[in-house]
């Protein structure tokens, strides 16, 4: 064997080792989730043992039970009729997104996130559904600022695009550069914004959202997937919304000193704490709580403790969304 042949084989083997050792999930892999409901370890690897699933440390899908139940469990927790009752006026003629957000798209998107509403007892699972739909209802509400029929908390999911975006939400980022002519304003149930969020989300769900950001307002299943991705994915120093609502997040001493304790209020802090938390009472936080209480009542579960973030300091840098 010649020297050049030996060198070529060595380089191929080296490439194989480097590529084969790439992390599989979490912040090391652009927010990707493990397949089959497996836990993502703090180092970005997928597995089902305590080394992968122990909290703190585990990044996502931290149930510790390996593959989670399929979406059939979700349909047993929230039926089509209940979904329609909760999002009562989403298809009203006054809502620009009427006809877009469907129950079928919600269930289909959940198949990509099998840990959603499958962890803990039935009350915990229903509470996660209520919290997810409440936060996203606030982001897409059509019931604020007027005497809405059936009250403001029956008007979630009225919008799928940000109103009058102040910019294109394009930041300099070598990993997720903006595509020419594309804008990354809020879209979908969670009103995902900024190119780096579109890039991370797209990588995790297998869709090129940097070049096709409008998919979040034209394809309802992909739109719901973007919201589930945000919900399930921790972005340091923030835990995931999922881990908070199922009780898998343990606040650090710094968190407690900042007033960040387990409960629905921390989820608001994760989503939009920089604008809404640590400022005392405000209408935005109250609106999020109002949706949550209504949905918990419909599902027949208690609210839990610490619903607001009025006295919580915001988290540091990480993924966030801008409210409409």
Swiss-Prot record:
Its EC number is 3.2.1.14. It is an enzyme of class 3 (hydrolase). Pfam families: Chitin_bind_1 (PF00187), Glyco_hydro_19 (PF00182). GO terms for molecular function: chitin binding; chitinase activity; endochitinase activity. The keyword Acetylation does not apply. It comes from the Eukaryota. Residues 318-324 form a propeptide. The active site is at 139 (proton donor). Residues 23-64 form the Chitin-binding type-1 domain. PROSITE patterns: CHIT_BIND_I_1 (PS00026), CHIT_BIND_I_2 (PS50941), CHITINASE_19_1 (PS00773), CHITINASE_19_2 (PS00774). Disulfide bonds join 25-40, 34-46, 39-53, 58-62, 95-158, 170-178, 277-309. Residues 1-22 form the signal peptide. InterPro entries: Chitin-bd_1, Chitin-binding_1_CS, Endochitinase-like_sf, Glyco_hydro_19, Glyco_hydro_19_cat, Lysozyme-like_dom_sf. The keyword Ligase does not apply. It catalyses: Random endo-hydrolysis of N-acetyl-beta-D-glucosaminide (1->4)-beta-linkages in chitin and chitodextrins. Keywords: Carbohydrate metabolism, Chitin degradation, Chitin-binding, Disulfide bond, Glycosidase, Hydrolase, Plant defense, Polysaccharide degradation, Signal. PANTHER family: CHITINASE-RELATED, ENDOCHITINASE 1. Defense against chitin-containing fungal pathogens. Belongs to the glycosyl hydrolase 19 family. Chitinase class I subfamily. This is Endochitinase 1. It comes from Gossypium hirsutum (Upland cotton).
